[in-house]
Amino acid sequence: MEDKAQYVFALLGILATLYFVRWSTDPLRHIPAIGPSAPIVSYLSAYRYCRNAQSILQEGYHKYKVFRVSLVDRWVVVVSGADMNEELRKVPDTHVSFQEAADDLIQLKYTIAPDVNEHPIHTPVIRGPLTRNLGALFPDVVDEINVAFPELMPPAAKRGDWVAVSVRDTMGRIVSRASNRIFVGLPLCRNPDYLKTVVEFAFSVAKSRTIINAAPAVFRPIVGHFLPWAKRAVRNAGVHVKPLIRLRVSKMQDAGDDQTDKSCDYLMWLIEEAQKTKQNLDIVVQGILVSNFAAIHTSSNSITHSLLNLAAYPQHVQPLREEIEGIIKEYGWTKEAIGKMWKLDSFMRESQRLSGISGISVMRKVLQDITLSDGTYLPKGTLVVAAAFATHTDERYYENPEVFEPFRFYDMRTENDALRKQYVNTSREFITFGHGKHACPGRFFAVNELKAMMAYIILHYDVKLEEGVSRPENVWIWHNISPASTKVLFRERQSKVQ
């Protein structure tokens, strides 16, 4: 019995020694940590970060130029301030990788699908033909918005009654309709079973990510294997999308060299990208799903934040409505018209400044050892990010940074400098979409879609919060930010511009 006890104590001693050696030789140990950093107790820091990421990121930002926060299985290095954001943006792709950082933080190979994670065919399509053809595609987006709102809003709102609406759920369904009008077209973009599949998938990614990130790295392949949502979505979406793919490919083959009548839309661009990279066409289904995740999850959150602000600050509705009415009367429902809505653009950018989708941005994984300008050494394998929310609430860059000022960016714009402060643009002080060449490529499509939806709402509905309810606080889980589930009251207006 004594021998067994001695073996146990010896084993514990060896483990403790290994932990101490690992901790004392950790190449990130020289970087200040927010919370306990010693072995074992660092898990307490990870728990605190899960529950209180906002305050932890703010604390680190105001204390240090570079600091680190704890996840379950690793440290994440965070840089503070606009200058460091810019420095991180400029590190060459030979030394850091955005894609590998996204893989680690979002666990794409488990939460999305392994094929499209390895061969992201959607990225060049979004960055290239989708963005170039937004003007031509925009009428379809507007048409779907005009059809979807009357169908999906509660009937009582049409009778002029105030009705409570679950904004995030309803906006998610409308975003999915408008986005899939571009992704897969009519009539599939209105198919209830298909839409249920893509919407559930879009919101399952966050759930899967939370589960995976809570598991130690060694167990993640096992946990990931049993996560059902991505596999189910690929299977169910394939039932609807694969016949379209086969039809397109068949027509291309029948046409031979004469491709003058070839479809010019998102689905065809994905097919062409898959063929160009010699991928099985099943990857196109995954590309459609990833596109839906990016469109539905982020856009439904963004427009929900904007609507909560619109309902909480009703004094700003009239100037927005007057701007939208005047521009629509002159230019119609066109992409050009949306671009001229400077006040609406400012309102939504300000909403995004205070209520982005994440408290961090400009994520990178170090591929080769680098040293930052302040002397901080980052070894290969380090995850490094910028503190987005803390930057956006820094009084060095924004006057009264904690206050929602809807026309803050409108007041900064002039005819000669109209573009720099528009919603879609990034800067070292505004990193909601990332910054630099790895900034979100879909932001041009998303911003135009969201502004069209907001313009439609402002012209067709009055909105307000329930009596005695103020703008609810956002919900933080880890560094991920979501709008609260508070309902917003809607009432259809009798006088509106068509």
Swiss-Prot record:
Q: Its domain of life?
A: Eukaryota
- Cross-referenced InterPro entries: Cyt_P450 (IPR001128), Cyt_P450_CS (IPR017972), Cyt_P450_E_grp-I (IPR002401), Cyt_P450_sf (IPR036396)
Residue ranges annotated as transmembrane are 7-24
**What Enzyme Commission number(s) apply to this enzyme?**
1.-.-.-
Q: Which GO terms describe its molecular function?
A: heme binding; iron ion binding; monooxygenase activity; oxidoreductase activity, acting on paired donors, with incorporation or reduction of molecular oxygen
Please give the function described in this protein's UniProt entry: Cytochrome P450 monooxygenase that is able to use dehydroabietic acid and testosterone as substrates for oxidation, suggesting that the natural substrate(s) may be structurally related to steroid compounds.
- Annotated protein name in UniProt: Cytochrome P450 monooxygenase 110
Q: Which organism is it from?
A: Postia placenta (strain ATCC 44394 / Madison 698-R)
